[in-house]
Amino acid sequence: MKKLLFFPVIMLALQSCAQKKDYNLIVGTYTNTGKSEGIYVYDFDTNTAAVKAKTVTKNVENPSYLALGDGNKAIYAVNETSETSAVSAFGFDAASGKLTFLNKQATNGADPCYVIADKKNVITANYSGGSISVFGIEKSGALSAIKQLVKHTGKSIDKARQGSAHVHMAQFTPDHKYLVVDDLGTDKVYLYTYNPDGGNKVLTVKDSVAITPGAGPRHLVFSKDSKYAYLIHEIDGGITVFSYSDGNLTEIQKTKITEDGFKGENGAADIHLSPDGKFLYASNRGSENKITIFAIEKGGLLSVRGYVPTLGKGPRNFAIDPTGKYLLVAHQYTNDVVIFERNLETGALTDTGKRISVGAPVCLVFAPVK
């Protein structure tokens, strides 16, 4: 009888281990507030939203945006420090959450606010510099010297915000053939042909798309089927929907993230799709501090499904966990991450009551533990 009981116990234990879905949650911050020490790594259980602190990497200046390197073995962080701005490379041990500093390279463009990485290159979007910086990746994961610096020129109609180019995001297209670059200062989205082995000509400008004057394009995300792209505007709180095909963006819809009659201040920030591709979420700071929920309809068009207060101030960044069950909002000014549960059928958000206390969080990245 003891032997018969032994095997079910083992099976239950194995099932429990198989069902436990832990990810690393990596948090970038602004250290110049005096409330943060650098880059934080937490263990996040996607079954329960339980969070456990793992590591803190200190002495990193303003790591305000992060990118996970290919193979989950490196992390790249911008150092958003005005004229001394740089990008730092770290080795990453996913099991322990430990980051090991490898090296740092100047971006030669002030205030990098976005970074991406693939197998060959690391690319930063430099806001105040109005430029894009390209670095190679060494075998160790360290950064090469800068390979290419692309500077934008021009301005738009908002004299306070758009007196010069302000590159806010650089992102690969789904086919990885092009780079999409959002320029808040010029009200344009640029498309570059991407040649990863191109030496000092990794990027070659292909085209640009003009956005509504005064809109302030900030972040863009592609649909799950790669046929559509959704661009959020920081200044006017709008979203432009494009059809996408082989490096070409064609506008098909304009909408907004605010309710009718809104008279407050916009500060549209981040935009993400649910993992199943059925819902789009967008955050607004300013006087709103809300997440707007959209359903993605036939033909990639958006329809509003609701508006949810984020329960904090300054939702600069948010992330949906890989299972799609939870949406986490990083509040820059109230120094916490609020965890919402997401209804997979309706897209609705419900506060779990769970919080992560961390100083000036502005970037959330999920990464596998193994």
Can you say where each PLM-predicted feature lies in the sequence?
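Short loop/turn segments immediately following the C-termini of beta-strands
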Residues: 30-32, 80-82, 127-129, 137, ...
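Blade-loop segments of beta-propeller domains
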Residues: 53-119
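A short beta-strand motif characteristic of beta-propeller blades
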Residues: 52-58, 100-106, 147, 154-160, ...
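Beta-rich, blade/repeat-based domains predominating
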Residues: 35, 60-71, 108-119, 153-176, ...
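Asp-box/WD-like beta-propeller blade repeats and closely related beta-sheet repeat scaffolds
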Residues: 97-169
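Short loop/turn segments immediately following beta-strands, especially the blade-tip
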Residues: 42-49, 90-97, 134-144, 192-201, ...
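Bacterial Sec-dependent N-terminal signal peptides
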Residues: 1-23
